[in-house]
């Protein structure tokens, strides 16, 4: 037992031969730290993703490497010239910036675009707010939508259904087609599903 090394043994032997509790040995078996291969495998893209990137993005990557980008704005001042190198952020190996606010993505890139979009943004905001408020008012005014109950007779307008005509009944359950292996016909249950 004295021939065992401390690296392969789980017990350390004291000076008098008493077994001490389990502890880690101080000597390493390997010179380099062991790294799990799953960390590298987990970060690799799947085969389908790699194939899709090679098919759909190959012209884009060739254009970015060649120094040409398609214009991303409405005027020529915003578009890069083909002779210039692309910025570092557009290269495929560079780290992408953090996700921005979706409202800020549509900000103009030049003054020409800013004058076109300056009048457009308040109109869109006001119209969106108007439609939101109209839907909220409809929900508050329509008792049937808000509470799930029919409105009183005095509040019925032309746009709403006449509640006195509507007959309430339990919903009719439609038969569901099941595969043959899940069905069993017998005289006891009349051919119903089990």
Swiss-Prot record:
Keywords: Plasmid, Transposable element. Residues 90-103 have a biased composition (Polar residues). It comes from the Bacteria. It comes from Agrobacterium tumefaciens (strain T37). This is Insertion element IS136 uncharacterized 21.2 kDa protein. Residues 73-103 are annotated as: Disordered. The lineage of its organism: Bacteria, Pseudomonadati, Pseudomonadota, Alphaproteobacteria, Hyphomicrobiales.
């Amino acid at each position: 037992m004295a021939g065992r090394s401390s690296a392969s043994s789980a017990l350390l032997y004291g000076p008098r031969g008493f077994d001490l509790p389990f502890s880690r040995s101080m000597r390493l078996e390997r010179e380099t730290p062991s790294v799990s291969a799953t960390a590298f495998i987990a970060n690799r893209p799947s085969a389908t993703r790699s194939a899709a990137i090679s098919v759909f993005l190959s012209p884009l990557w060739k254009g970015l490497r060649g120094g040409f980008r398609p214009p991303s704005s409405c005027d020529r001042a915003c578009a890069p010239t083909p002779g210039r190198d692309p910025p570092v952020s557009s290269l495929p190996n560079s780290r992408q910036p953090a996700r921005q606010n979706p409202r800020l993505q549509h900000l103009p890139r030049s003054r020409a675009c800013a004058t076109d979009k300056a009048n457009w943004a308040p109109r869109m905001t006001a119209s969106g707010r108007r439609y939101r408020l109209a839907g909220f008012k409809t929900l508050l005014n329509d008792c049937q939508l808000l509470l799930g109950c029919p409105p009183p007779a005095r509040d019925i307008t032309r746009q709403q259904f006449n509640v006195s005509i509507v007959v309430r009944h339990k919903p009719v359950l439609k038969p569901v087609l099941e595969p043959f292996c899940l069905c069993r016909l017998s005289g006891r249950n009349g051919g119903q599903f089990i």
